[in-house]
From Swiss-Prot:
Organism per entry: Xenopus tropicalis
Protein function: The heterodimer acts as an E1 ligase for sumo1, sumo2, and sumo3. It mediates ATP-dependent activation of sumo proteins followed by formation of a thioester bond between a sumo protein and a conserved active site cysteine residue on uba2/sae2.
Protein name: SUMO-activating enzyme subunit 2
InterPro entries found in the cross-reference section: ThiF/MoeB/HesA, ThiF_NAD_FAD-bd, UAE_UbL_dom, Ub-E1_IAD_1, Ub_act_enz_dom_a_sf, Uba2, UBA2_C, Ubiquitin-activating_enz
GO function terms (MF aspect): ATP binding; metal ion binding; SUMO activating enzyme activity; transferase activity
Length: 641
């Protein structure tokens, strides 16, 4: 405990008696736990739902190969106790969003330190700390970039005060009918995995979209196609999974359906190909006859890094067949009704997506990608740098010491940059902003306006897409402000299930209606004003109006913001939590560079816009939100899930 002896007496006592909650035991979490006990913090609780994977071992130093498959939180506790046996550590192998961890649970702690890897959990912890009145230290890293900030109720902005850029999405008809970029094919392949082996989702259909308006000369033709049934080639007669099951997941039949028959059907939509190069169907038998031709390449591909090699189309077909057989066996072992979950670190699942995506790229005349590239794009991977995690975890502890000293006004949002700014600083501290009076989370009376079509939005969509996904509620209850207190949604299981498939207009909800949404777990109430519109954009179900735009700021430093994660190699690392995991794991808005842009240029602009803080070279964040640094488009890092 060398550090605690260097602290002032009162602070040292506060350190030794305080109780902290660390949420996350991954890249930052491991470094943070080590720093905390070496500083003198001995009363710690750590929670993490994940288990240890081999890919974690290169930077999460509390774990060893023998720990693979075990709880991160439990092993982190055991490892820390080896060099600090006097520590009192409680480990939870669980999701922080579990209702057991309510406001009373959070009130046990002096402060909370986040080391998370998904936006939904960050939002939830933010709200729980606000409800409990407990200071929160938020953090994240992405490669060489990092960020730390402090959230304190009524004093600073909360995590949700500023809008976060939404994930990049693609129209369904582009994915299914007219892919033009490799990422379109990779998204399609991930959808295909779920349609065949996982949980089916109507929004992730992979068969040709026969109702694509672009494929018809007029809207009536699109409607006629959509209503077609029981005709030769009508791919909507049965679901993809039903058809695959009926064939016993025969790889060759699957191949010919997906890459020959469906492509031939697409070619019948001739209007799609008047200004595009038409796809070229593939047939298993023709590729199989060329199998010997690919042997030379396959042998040469063994040289160097295997995952960096781009396979030819025949090799991709063979990889597709092999992965289907392996995944089929995994399903059989799990039993009837079982489902698989796609994981970038599961070799058969990754092989399947790599093969299927590349075959589709070949069909649509795109350059095929290596397994490494596909994995990066499919998993939204940002290379992890262990030293970045170490620096950020150290900054978390320093901000925590300021809070314990009662010097919250000295707390800062600190950015770690890839290159020194014009002042030759890698660390750029900014003063904390006050709460946003328009924030729909921490405002005195949280209120928001949502534009939607009341005749199309169902109660289920309101609950899942708007309340849970957009506004990060866990178990919402919704009451219509109609003078009667009509209950639209109840968190009690089964109580309002009959409402789920009904349009909200059926309950008298119209333009200017108000809904009161409560989440008792989060101790959070949100008033929702309904703005009805008959003219919503295509593929847009709703839009948040006002200070929290659905698409985020006009020109945010999107790459740098969305890339900030918990230091894992995957900004969207799969979690077994039922919560919606977001691949664009965000923290508070940042003004540092994107990985591909010029850090010096951005910070030069910053210097001209911002004042110095007393006694230190810092940057005020009062104008931070107006800064619009140039951002280079990077289609290789895209949020998918």
């Amino acid at each position: 405990m060398a550090m605690i002896g260097a602290l002032p007496k009162e602070l040292a006592e506060a350190v030794s008696t305080s109780r902290l909650l660390v949420v996350g035991a991954g890249g930052i979490g491991c470094e943070l736990l080590k720093n905390l006990v070496l500083t003198g913090f001995i009363n710690l609780d750590v929670i993490d739902l994940d288990t240890i994977d081999v890919s974690n071992l290169n930077r999460q130093f509390l774990f060893q190969k023998k720990h693979v498959g075990r709880s991160k939180a439990q092993v982190a506790k055991e490892s820390v106790l080896q060099f600090c046996p006097e520590a009192n550590i409680t480990a939870y192998h669980d999701s922080i969003m579990n209702p057991d961890y309510n406001v009373e649970f959070f009130k046990q702690f002096t402060m909370v330190m986040n080391a998370l890897d998904n936006n939904a959990a960050r939002n939830h912890v933010n709200r729980m700390c606000l409800a409990a009145g407990i200071p929160l230290i938020e953090s994240g890293t992405a490669g060489y970039l990092g960020q730390v900030t402090v959230v304190k109720k009524g004093v600073t902005e909360c995590y949700e005060c500023q809008p976060k850029p939404t994930q990049k999405t693609f129209p369904g008809c582009t994915i299914r009918n007219t892919p033009s970029e490799p990422i379109h094919c990779i998204v399609w392949a991930k959808y295909l995995f779920n349609q065949l082996f996982g949980e089916e989702d109507a929004d992730q259909e992979v068969a040709p979209d026969i109702a694509d308006p672009e494929a018809a000369w007029d809207p009536t033709q699109a409607a006629e196609r959509a209503n077609a049934s029981n005709v030769d080639g009508d791919i909507k007669r049965v679901s993809t999974k039903q058809w695959a099951k009926s064939t016993g997941y025969d790889p060759i039949k699957l191949f010919n359906k997906l890459f020959r028959d469906d492509i031939k059907y697409l070619l019948t939509m001739d209007r799609l190909w008047r200004k595009r190069k038409p796809p070229v169907p593939l047939e298993w038998s023709s590729l199989h006859n060329k199998e010997n031709c690919s042997e030379t390449q396959n042998e040469s591909s063994l040289q160097g890094l295997k995952d960096q090699k781009v396979l030819d189309v025949t090799s991709c077909a063979q990889l597709f067949s092999k992965s289907v057989e392996t995944l089929r066996e995994q399903l059989r072992e799990k039993g009837n009704g079982a489902e698989l979950v796609w994981d970038k670190d599961d070799p058969p699942a990754m092989d399947f997506v790599t093969a299927a995506a590349n075959l589709r790229m070949h069909i649509f005349s795109m350059n095929m990608k290596s397994r490494f590239d596909v994995k990066s794009m499919a998993g939204n991977i940002i290379p992890a740098i262990a030293t970045t995690n170490a620096v950020i975890s150290g900054l978390i502890v320093l901000e925590g010491l300021k809070i314990l000293s009662g010097n919250t006004e000295q707390c800062r949002t600190v950015f770690l940059n890839k290159q020194p700014n014009p002042r030759k600083k890698l660390l750029v501290p900014c003063s904390l902003d006050p709460p946003n009076p328009s924030c729909y989370v921490c405002a005195i009376k949280p209120e928001v306006t949502v534009k939607l079509n009341v005749h199309k939005v169902t109660v289920q969509m309101l609950q899942d897409k708007i309340l849970k996904e957009k506004f990060a509620m866990v178990a919402p209850d919704v009451q219509i402000e109609d003078g009667k207190g009509t209950i639209l949604i109840s968190s009690e299981a089964g109580e309002t299930d009959a409402n789920n498939n009904r349009k909200i207009s059926e309950f008298g909800i119209r333009n200017s209606s108000q809904l009161q949404a409560d989440d008792f777990l989060q101790d959070y109430t949100l008033m929702i004003n309904i703005l009805h519109s008959d003219e919503m954009e295509k593929d847009v179900d709703f839009e948040v109006v006002g200070d929290v735009p659905e698409k985020g700021p006009q020109k945010p430093s999107e790459q740098s913001v969305k890339n900030i994660t918990n230091g894992s190699d995957d900004g969207a690392q799969p979690s077994t939590s039922k919560a919606q995991d977001q691949d664009d794991v965000l923290i508070v808005d940042s003004d540092e560079e994107s990985p591909s842009s010029s850090n010096a240029d951005i910070n030069m602009d910053s210097a001209s816009l911002k004042r110095k803080l007393p006694e230190e070279e810092t940057i005020s964040s009062t104008k931070r939100k107006r800064l619009e640094p140039p951002v280079e488009e990077d289609d290789d890092i895209i949020a998918l899930d």
